[in-house]
């Protein structure tokens, strides 16, 4: 990995996570469009802009490798379905006043990844990792006890993204070509949805004279730009550094939920966040100690 320019890496990494953290502002701008329809257009425009970007930003041999390995294509079809489910849940949560739950979901995602590694890949957890996962579990259990139901938005976001990452590891394709293939595999479903929903907002000609239409078209660049920034940052920074930066996005979502959109941060929700933050602190310290020992 090239790490010759850490300053550039930090700028690119921060840019990626800040854009991801500010996604709620974008989705609020098209809140009148149903979440499913937003995702349909996110798939279509990401596929189009991604294909154009691949023509400019060359990735030699990626399509030949996929064509010669149908198993990887099948894996990308499955991972594409998972990321679409993740996108749908996130957009729905933002536009239905559940941003705090969305933030919680992305906070617990690293700990869910650790748990999936143990349960599915047979990885052995270190003592501090057990403590981190346990603290997060207490936070979720506390929410169930106080609210009387599972924080399903948080769990769906964390699990779909966790399984997405797990499955994508089975198809070693670079991020941009992988995302382009994932979205193109969903394009037939997206087109079929539009054909069978003639009353949809974007199926009306007059809709395309509104500003919301341009916001929908922007779904392609909005999806791809932070991904490109992240991939570029990964060439200049250690992956563990990017791991620490990832907490910026859910923090921005949390701040927007409370300060901009008036979501109520109850004492019980705050307690859940505190347990999960404590778990993340333990997880981060453990990752730092492990890195020091390896080096």
Question: Which ranges hold each PLM region?
Answer:
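Glycine-/small-residue-enriched transmembrane alpha-helix faces in small-molecule transporters
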Residues: 1-37, 141-170, 192, 295
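Membrane-interface interhelical linkers
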Residues: 1-15, 48-76, 127, 179, ...
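Hydrophobic alpha-helical transmembrane segments of multi-pass membrane transport proteins
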Residues: 18-22, 26, 77-94, 156-167, ...
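Juxtamembrane helix-loop-helix junctions in multi-pass membrane proteins
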Residues: 21-47, 101, 163-188, 202
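C-terminal-most transmembrane helix of multi-pass membrane proteins
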Residues: 43, 247-295
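Hydrophobic transmembrane alpha-helices of multi-pass small-molecule transport proteins
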Residues: 50, 128-144, 157, 268-287
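C-terminal transmembrane-helix exit sites in multi-pass transporters
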Residues: 92, 109-129, 251-270
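Helix-helix packing/entry segments at the starts of transmembrane helices
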Residues: 104-108, 173-185, 224-259
């Amino acid at each position: 990995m090239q790490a010759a320019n850490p300053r550039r890496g930090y700028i690119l990494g921060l840019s990626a996570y800040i854009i991801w953290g500010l996604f709620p502002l974008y989705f609020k701008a098209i809140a009148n469009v149903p979440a499913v329809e937003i995702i349909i257009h996110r798939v279509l425009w990401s596929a189009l802009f991604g294909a154009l970007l691949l023509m400019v930003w060359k990735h030699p041999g990626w399509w030949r490798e996929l064509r010669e390995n149908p198993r990887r294509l099948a894996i990308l079809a499955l991972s594409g379905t998972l990321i679409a489910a993740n996108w749908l849940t996130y957009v729905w949560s933002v536009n239905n006043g559940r941003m705090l739950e969305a933030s919680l979901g992305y906070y617990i995602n690293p700990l869910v990844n650790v748990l999936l590694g143990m349960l599915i890949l047979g990885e052995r957890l270190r003592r501090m990792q057990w403590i981190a996962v346990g603290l997060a579990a207490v936070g979720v259990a506390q929410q169930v006890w106080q609210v009387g139901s599972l924080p399903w938005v948080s769990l769906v976001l964390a699990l779909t993204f966790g399984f997405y990452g797990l499955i994508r590891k089975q198809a070693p394709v670079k991020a941009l070509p992988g995302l382009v293939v994932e979205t193109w595999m969903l394009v037939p479903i997206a087109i079929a949805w539009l054909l069978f929903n003639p009353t949809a907002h974007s199926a009306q000609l007059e809709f395309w004279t509104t500003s919301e239409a341009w916001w929908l078209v922007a779904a392609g660049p909005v999806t791809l730009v932070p991904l490109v920034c992240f991939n570029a940052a990964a060439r200049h920074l250690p992956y563990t550094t990017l791991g620490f930066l990832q907490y910026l996005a859910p923090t921005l979502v949390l701040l927007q939920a409370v300060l901009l959109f008036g979501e109520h941060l109850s004492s019980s929700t705050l307690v859940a966040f505190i347990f999960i933050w404590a778990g993340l602190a333990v997880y981060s310290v453990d990752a730092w100690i492990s890195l020091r020992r390896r080096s």
